[in-house]
């Protein structure tokens, strides 16, 4: 019973510890009252009292201080993990890890605990009614009932057997250290090692184990190990909804009972869980011990596994702290690097601006220095000249004074002359001053002109750069034109190959037609020779007529395709002519605007002459580019026509339905007669005239037995894009009745009619090939 009391006391101690850490005062008092009742009940049932219970009851404040001191603070993994990690570790934090000296139970013990409490929970659900989980008296009553029921059954014999096995496995081990908390004897007992589990002091009906109970336990254990559907609760994949309900709704006073139900529900409906399901906490915090497994290696492996899990969790927390620290350092270094980069860019910009200012100031200083030197030289020259004038004036005055002294008579004349000379000198001096002012104005004009020349030089350089850029663009256009010319040559070669294939097909069809004519002649001779083979000859004649009809349908389909190509060619030619005219008008307008708005160069300066030559070259380049652009437009139109021809489906030539006959030269004549198409030359009309005459002569040369083939004409619409068929129904009817009428004629008439039809169609095909080329 000491073991049962230790387990229940340990659970209550841990709940009180959690409540003292996170709960309020009323719930803490309720838990302390429950612990006192449990200790009193355990002391009365076992016959022996705990000497430390009074200390524990009398001094709850000291125990609270010691519990808060001995509780290990979280290392940061609760705050560093995500929501999934917090959801996984909430049950683990509610049932804390044992202290360093506490011995962990084995897997067999934990399994026996869970099985026994599952059975007890099922019995309490069947026999008990609805209980209020929030009452303190109800919780203490439930715990007393659980302690009372543990004294019954076959737990006594099993506990004795497990005690013997544990003593044999561990030997006579002396408790080496005591707990640091003297107010809670449960912690001291758990750190001293496993207590000897004797039989309960009192309990009604002590009986032995049921037969074959260990075998059933081993079978359930093997089923739980081999079943892959159940995973440990420590894995991130095993998350049950009841854990969140327990954390959110159930108060921490009775969190222990809800944990019991959470661990018992999977055992009521399914095989036992994996051994790692109880890895996050000691099994004694969930249920009292009932069974222990006989092998000793599993205990060491379980403790090693738990120690490894603890080390992994500590390492994970340390790595997460290091990761956050490194992330903060990385953010700070990145901010510093960005600031340094901004400072470097600003310094570089300032240095460049300073260099440009230094260059401009040096130029300005050099210019000012030259002008100042010129002005100083001019002023020195004028000062020398003024000094000379003064010296001359002084000499004249001295000479005048000497003359007055020598001769008083002629002094007045000399004074007048000297006055006149002085007046002239004054005028000359004023003139020199005016010239100096003019020179100063000229200096200012030269300075302004130099600035204007610098601006013109910058503009000319910018225009030259733009001209070079346009030249590069136009060179790229020229390269594109060359590539398009190459593609055009390739398309022309492909079209020639296709025309050769069509010509071969035409010749093969003509050969087949000749063979059919020979067969018809043979059948005609056979029908004229004897009457015994009339049935077979009629069948062969019908078969030959069907073959001839099929060949005629193929020929008519080819003719229809050729007329369609002719119509597309005419449309593309008209569009190309329109595009070329538009491009020519646009180029002419650009030329006129450029010539009109071109700057008029002044022939007085060499700089303007250079600008004139550059503008002339630029205009020549633009005219050349306009010519190339017109050529590109023309070749683009030709390429579009060839691309439409290449996209033509070749399978349309072998259509099985009978299509109306369309005479190619008649269409061509109608197109020439229409005012919408003005692009044909007189040579094409002359080459087309014999073909129309042969077509017109073809039906006239046939015998009266064969119905004439009416000319099929097309009426062009106003925009030239649509055409309407004339007597298409009559033409199709005539073509449908043509093989029958040919069969009804004799051999010579049939041969002449087929030859004339073949000749006219070959001529039409040759004309169309020439037109397309």
UniProtKB/Swiss-Prot annotation:
One of its GO terms (molecular function) is identical protein binding. Residues 41-157, 169-238, 259-309, 589-611, 677-754 are annotated as: Disordered. The modification Phosphotyrosine is found at residue 107. Residues 220-302 are annotated as: Required for interaction with CDH1. The record marks 107 as: Required for interaction with MAGI1 and ACTB. Residues 304-577 form a coiled coil. GO terms for biological process: actin cytoskeleton organization; angiogenesis; endothelial cell morphogenesis; establishment of cell polarity involved in ameboidal cell migration; hippo signaling; negative regulation of transcription by RNA polymerase II; positive regulation of protein localization; regulation of cell migration. It holds the Pfam family Angiomotin_C. There is a cross-link at residues 342, 403 (Glycyl lysine isopeptide (Lys-Gly) (interchain with G-Cter in ubiquitin)). Its main location: other. Keywords: Cell junction, Cell projection, Coiled coil, Cytoplasm, Endosome, Isopeptide bond, Phosphoprotein, Ubl conjugation, Wnt signaling pathway. Residues 196-213, 701-710 have a biased composition (Pro residues). Monoubiquitinated at Lys-342 and Lys-403 by Crumbs complex-bound WWP1. De-ubiquitinated at Lys-342 and Lys-403 by USP9X; the interaction may be promoted by cell contact inhibition. Deubiquitination of AMOTL2 negatively regulates Hippo signaling activation. Residues 80-91, 100-112, 141-152 have a biased composition (Basic and acidic residues). It comes from the Eukaryota. Residues 101-302 are annotated as: Required for interaction with CDH5. GO terms for cellular component: apical plasma membrane; bicellular tight junction; cell junction; cell projection; cytoplasm; cytoplasmic vesicle; plasma membrane; podosome. The modification Phosphoserine is found at residues 753, 756. It is found in: Recycling endosome; Cytoplasm; Cell projection, Podosome; Cell junction. Residues 177-190, 719-734 have a biased composition (Polar residues). InterPro entries: Angiomotin (IPR009114), Angiomotin-like (IPR051747), Angiomotin_C (IPR024646). A motif (PDZ-binding) lies at residues 770-773. Belongs to the angiomotin family. Regulates the translocation of phosphorylated SRC to peripheral cell-matrix adhesion sites. Required for proper architecture of actin filaments. Plays a role in coupling actin fibers to cell junctions in endothelial cells and is therefore required for correct endothelial cell morphology via facilitating transcellular transmission of mechanical force resulting in endothelial cell elongation. Required for the anchoring of radial actin fibers to CDH1 junction complexes at the cell membrane which facilitates organization of radial actin fiber structure and cellular response to contractile forces. Part of a complex composed of AMOTL2, MAGI1 and CDH5, within the complex AMOTL2 acts as a scaffold protein for the interaction of MAGI1 with CDH5. The complex is required for coupling actin fibers to cell junctions in endothelial cells. Within the complex AMOTL2 (via its N-terminus) interacts with CDH5. Interacts (via N-terminus) with MAGI1. Interacts (via N-terminus) with ACTB; the interaction facilitates binding of cell junction complexes to actin fibers in endothelial cells. Interacts with CDH1; the interaction may facilitate binding of radial actin fibers to cell junction complexes. This is Angiomotin-like protein 2. It comes from Rattus norvegicus (Rat).
């Amino acid at each position: 019973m000491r073991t049962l009391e230790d387990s229940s006391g340990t659970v209550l101690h841990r709940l009180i510890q959690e409540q003292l850490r996170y709960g309020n005062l009323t719930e803490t008092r309720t838990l302390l009252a429950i612990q006192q009742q449990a200790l009193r009940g355990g002391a009365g049932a076992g016959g022996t009292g705990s000497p430390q219970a009074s200390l524990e009851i009398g001094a709850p404040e000291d125990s609270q201080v010691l519990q808060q001191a001995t509780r290990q603070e979280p290392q940061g993994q609760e705050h560093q993990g995500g929501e999934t990690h917090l959801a996984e570790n909430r049950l683990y934090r509610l049932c804390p890890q044992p202290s360093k000296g506490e011995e962990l139970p084995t897997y067999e013990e934990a399994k026996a605990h869970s099985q026994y409490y599952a059975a007890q929970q099922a019995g309490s659900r069947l026999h008990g009614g609805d209980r209020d989980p929030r009452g303190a008296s109800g919780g203490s009553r439930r715990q007393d009932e659980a302690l009372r029921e543990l004294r019954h059954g076959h737990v006594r014999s099993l506990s004795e057997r497990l005690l013997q096995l544990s003593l044999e496995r561990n030997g006579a081990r002396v408790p080496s250290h005591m707990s640091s908390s003297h107010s809670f004897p449960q912690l001291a007992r758990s750190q001293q090692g496993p207590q000897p589990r004797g039989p309960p002091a009192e309990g009604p009906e002590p009986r032995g184990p049921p037969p074959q109970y260990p075998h059933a336990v081993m079978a359930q254990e093997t089923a739980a190990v081999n079943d892959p559907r159940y995973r440990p609760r420590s894995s991130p994949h095993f998350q049950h909804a009841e854990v969140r309900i327990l954390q959110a709704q159930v108060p921490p006073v009775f969190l222990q009972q809800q944990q019991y139900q959470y661990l018992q529900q999977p055992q009521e409906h399914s095989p036992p869980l994996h051994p790692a399901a109880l890895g996050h906490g000691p099994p004694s915090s969930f249920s009292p011990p009932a069974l222990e497994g006989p092998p000793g290696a599993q205990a060491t492996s379980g403790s090693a596994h738990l120690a490894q899990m603890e080390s992994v969790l500590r390492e994970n927390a340390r790595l997460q702290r290091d990761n956050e620290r490194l992330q903060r350092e990385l953010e700070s270094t990145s901010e510093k690097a960005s600031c340094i980069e901004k400072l470097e860019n600003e310094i570089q910009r300032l240095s460049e601006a300073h260099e440009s200012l230094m260059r401009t100031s040096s130029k300005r200083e050099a210019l000012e220095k030259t002008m100042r030197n010129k002005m100083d030289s001019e002023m020195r020259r004028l000062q020398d000249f003024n000094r000379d004038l003064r010296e001359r004036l002084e000499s004249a005055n001295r000479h005048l004074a000497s003359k007055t002294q020598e001769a008083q008579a002629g002094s007045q004349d000399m004074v007048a002359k000297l006055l006149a000379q002085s007046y002239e000198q004054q005028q000359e001096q004023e003139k020199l001053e005016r010239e100096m002012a003019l020179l100063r104005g000229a200096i200012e004009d030269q300075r302004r002109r130099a600035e204007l020349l610098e601006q013109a030089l910058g503009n000319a350089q910018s225009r030259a750069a733009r001209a070079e850029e346009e030249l590069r663009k136009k060179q790229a256009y020229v390269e594109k034109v060359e590539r398009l010319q190459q593609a055009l040559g390739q398309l022309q070669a492909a079209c020639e190959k296709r025309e050769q294939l069509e010509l071969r097909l035409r010749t093969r069809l003509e050969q087949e037609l000749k063979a059919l004519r020979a067969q018809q002649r043979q059948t005609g001779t056979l029908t004229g020779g004897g009457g015994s083979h009339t049935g077979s000859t009629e069948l062969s004649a019908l078969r030959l007529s069907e073959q001839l009809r099929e060949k005629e349908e193929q020929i008519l389909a080819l003719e229809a395709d050729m007329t369609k190509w002719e119509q597309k060619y005419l449309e593309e030619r008209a569009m190309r002519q329109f595009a070329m005219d538009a491009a020519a008008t646009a180029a002419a307008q650009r030329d006129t605007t450029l010539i009109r708005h071109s700057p008029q160069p002044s022939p007085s300066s060499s700089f303007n002459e250079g600008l004139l030559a550059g503008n002339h070259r630029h205009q020549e380049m633009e005219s050349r580019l306009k010519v190339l652009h017109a050529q590109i437009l023309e070749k683009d139109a030709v390429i579009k026509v060839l691309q439409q021809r290449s996209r033509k489906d070749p399978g349309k030539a072998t259509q099985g339905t009978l299509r109306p006959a369309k005479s190619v030269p008649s269409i061509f004549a109608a197109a020439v007669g229409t005012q919408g198409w003005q692009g044909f030359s007189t040579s094409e009309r002359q080459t087309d005239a014999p073909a129309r005459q042969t077509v017109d002569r073809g039906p006239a040369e046939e015998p009266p037995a064969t119905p004439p083939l009416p000319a099929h004409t097309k009426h062009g619409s106003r925009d030239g894009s649509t055409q309407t068929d004339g007597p298409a129904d009559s033409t199709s009817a005539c073509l449908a009745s043509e093989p029958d009428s040919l069969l009804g004629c004799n051999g010579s008439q049939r041969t002449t009619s087929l030859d004339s039809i073949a000749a006219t169609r070959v001529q039409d095909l040759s004309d169309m090939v020439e037109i397309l080329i």
